[in-house]
Amino acid sequence: FIMPDKMSMEKIKALRAVGAKVVVTPTDVEPEDPRSYYSVSRRIAEETPNAFYANQYHNPSNPETHYKTTGPEIWEQTQGDFDVFVAGMGTGGTITGTGRYLKEKKPEMITVGVDPVGSLYYDYFKTGKLTEAHSYKVEGIGEDFLPSTMNFEYVDEVIRVTDKECFDMARRLVRHEGVLCGQSCGASVAGAVKYAEMMGRKM
């Protein structure tokens, strides 16, 4: 299992506890760098017999799975009684697949992506230009390149959040709601609150 060094030690220990071999790679290198987790995972898959390289950044099964499962689950559990769907943006699979399904069911609904400061999605959505990404601590969302699994056709707005906002919201959810979650969940909720406030809702 290959992961960047900004991932929490708890995740690494949990994987090792169930027998996984974990290879930790540096975060602050370009995707093309041979030390990046993209490059290392691809190399290990090529060198390992019977290995499967999921390639979640360019595998159409990623958004398709969310189209077939996550979208219908949200629709069934809410009975379509919602106006906005908010999700963190990492590989783009969740927001692309789920957003596509929900917009087919309810075209007027709004899909909001949440992006950490340091990632390039926010600037790309607003300007159409790729900017240079820089480091951030939130795990699991944000990107320093454009995966083919990210389709902005299904995204209506992108909200930018700071590391502090993500961590603070994750702690708030644990303390006040009893929801044991990580920073990317905190990011999504912080982004949802920001969007609601932008729309004039008091939170």
Predicted regions and their residues:
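Structural motif
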Residues: 1, 20-23, 50-53, 83-84, ...
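Short glycine/serine/threonine-rich phosphate/pyrophosphate-binding segments
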Residues: 1, 7-12, 88-99, 121, ...
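Active-site/ligand-binding-proximal alpha/beta "capping" segment
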Residues: 48-89, 152, 156, 160-179
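Surface-exposed amphipathic alpha-helices with a cationic face
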Residues: 16, 99-106
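Fold-independent oxyanion-binding glycine-rich loops
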Residues: 3-5, 26, 55-58, 70, ...
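Phosphate-binding loop/pocket of nucleotide- and phosphate-handling active sites
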Residues: 135, 190-203
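Active-site-proximal loop->helix
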Residues: 1-44, 117, 121-132, 146-147
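Active-site/ligand-binding loops adjacent to catalytic centers
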Residues: 38, 50, 104-183
